Amino acid sequence: MATTVKELKATARPKSGKGAARAERRAGRVPGVIYGNNQPPVTISIEDRELRQRILAGRFLTTLVDIDLEGKKHRVIPRDYHLDPVKDFPIHVDFMRLGEGATIRISVPLHVVKSEASPGVKRGGTVNIVAHAIELECGVESIPQYIEADVGSLEIGHSLHLSDVKLPAGVKALTREDATLVTIVPPSGYAEEQKAAAAAAAGGAAPAAAAPAAGAAAPAAAAPAAAAKAPAGGDKKK
């Protein structure tokens, strides 16, 4: 599977520490770091506006990035970012450097599909997403943007497990196979309706069992004696 690689420009940050980071933010830049692949970490800064757009676009943590650091390319993947707790803008970002042919453990979002075709949803049930992401291990060139969870055949009360999901080639799940991903939750009052329907069915079956089978013959009348005896003391021939 081909993985999309985005480009991002960065500037080397010669100083580290809280004071230097605050100075970068005042200048409209977000401090960050590139680490990993048995190389020393490199402190960088990125334009706040550009980084914010990348984060808001979605799938930021599963997208490969080529960081252009003063003419030198670094193939990385975002591993974490921090937002200001009040103003909600990025204040720091971490990138992990990737070597050629490396494998990576990554959390990939779950994408539910065909919910409108689910028999359970058609009967008033609701799709309940239990796991919003799946932990995977794969090559850096095979990172899926998301994993599809097809719920088109689920009835009310049924669940979709990890073992029901087809993963792309070369991708291994780190979560146990029986993990529940999605369930179809019954609507309000569904249990009472089911009990009432079962009681009505049981009540209708009892009188039916007591009634005689259709077309059954009525009890036969007592058969007359095969040959009636002559009355005792009858007239004799003279």
UniProtKB/Swiss-Prot annotation:
Top-rank lineage group of the source organism: Bacteria
Pfam families registered for this protein in UniProt: Ribosomal_L25p, Ribosomal_TL5_C
One Gene Ontology CC term in the entry: cytosolic large ribosomal subunit
Keyword annotations: Ribonucleoprotein, Ribosomal protein, RNA-binding, rRNA-binding
Compositionally biased intervals (Basic and acidic residues): 1-10
Organism: Bradyrhizobium diazoefficiens (strain JCM 10833 / BCRC 13528 / IAM 13628 / NBRC 14792 / USDA 110)
Function: This is one of the proteins that binds to the 5S RNA in the ribosome where it forms part of the central protuberance.
Annotated gene: rplY
Matching InterPro entries: Rbsml_bL25/Gln-tRNA_synth_N (IPR020056), Ribosomal_bL25/Gln-tRNA_synth (IPR011035), Ribosomal_bL25_b-dom (IPR020057), Ribosomal_bL25_C (IPR037121), Ribosomal_bL25_long (IPR001021), Ribosomal_L25_dom (IPR029751), Ribosomal_P1/P2_euk (IPR001859), Ribosomal_uL5_bac-type (IPR020930)
Lineage: Bacteria, Pseudomonadati, Pseudomonadota, Alphaproteobacteria, Hyphomicrobiales
GO biological process terms, semicolon-separated: translation
One of the record's GO molecular function terms: structural constituent of ribosome
Region (Disordered): 1-24
Transmembrane segments: none
Protein name according to UniProt: Large ribosomal subunit protein bL25
Quaternary structure and interacting proteins, as annotated: Part of the 50S ribosomal subunit; part of the 5S rRNA/L5/L18/L25 subcomplex. Contacts the 5S rRNA. Binds to the 5S rRNA independently of L5 and L18.
Stated family: Belongs to the bacterial ribosomal protein bL25 family. CTC subfamily.
